[in-house]
């Protein structure tokens, strides 16, 4: 889990090496701060050599809102570069690549406006998050546009995966996210390819 510092950004692989945590540096003074949050050349060299084609943003008004776990099938499989621009969230990636040594395993990171951290979730992983503060805004760049036909999901609280979600009094989910299949019910969506 060693990290590398290059220019104004620091990144580290998490316990699933393909998932990366990126921490852009902040330069502050009496006016506030400046932070470079994305540079394509740096990203392609150090994180993933992919193009990011769309930028999305969502607001979750209530604490304990769960969105996910989501992924898309080929040819619209999405890698996601996720950041929190207001509030805070518990962000999760689950490996859904059949044959992977980390299939069904998960990693997480807390992303917040304060820490400025970003999570790279490659294609072949389901992604989801839970808000830790009210009025949390998440922004994420993706490698492929949304396709309803290729949109899939995974049960957020599947005991076979065992995500250690933060404890909340109430969880807020959409009907769609409440009825996603468990890992054992999931058809083969991605095959692991060792490189």
Swiss-Prot record:
**Keywords (A to Z) from UniProt:** Carbohydrate metabolism, Isomerase, Plasmid
Q: Which Pfam families match?
A: dTDP_sugar_isom
Q: Which GO terms describe its cellular component?
A: cytosol
What are the GO MF terms of this UniProt record? dTDP-4-dehydrorhamnose 3,5-epimerase activity
Similarity section: Belongs to the dTDP-4-dehydrorhamnose 3,5-epimerase family.
Enzyme class, top EC level, equals isomerase
Residue positions annotated to bind substrate are: 31, 36, 54-56, 67, 80, 127, 151, 176
Site note Participates in a stacking interaction with the thymidine ring of dTDP-4-oxo-6-deoxyglucose applies to 146
Single GO BP term: polysaccharide biosynthetic process
Q: Does the keyword Isomerase apply?
A: yes
Q: What is this protein called?
A: dTDP-4-dehydrorhamnose 3,5-epimerase
- Please name the Gene3D superfamilies in this protein's record: Jelly Rolls
**Which InterPro entries does UniProt cross-reference here?**
RmlC-like, RmlC-like_jellyroll, RmlC_Cupin_sf
Organism annotation: Sinorhizobium fredii (strain NBRC 101917 / NGR234)
- Function description: Catalyzes the epimerization of the C3' and C5'positions of dTDP-6-deoxy-D-xylo-4-hexulose, forming dTDP-6-deoxy-L-lyxo-4-hexulose.
E.C. no: 5.1.3.13
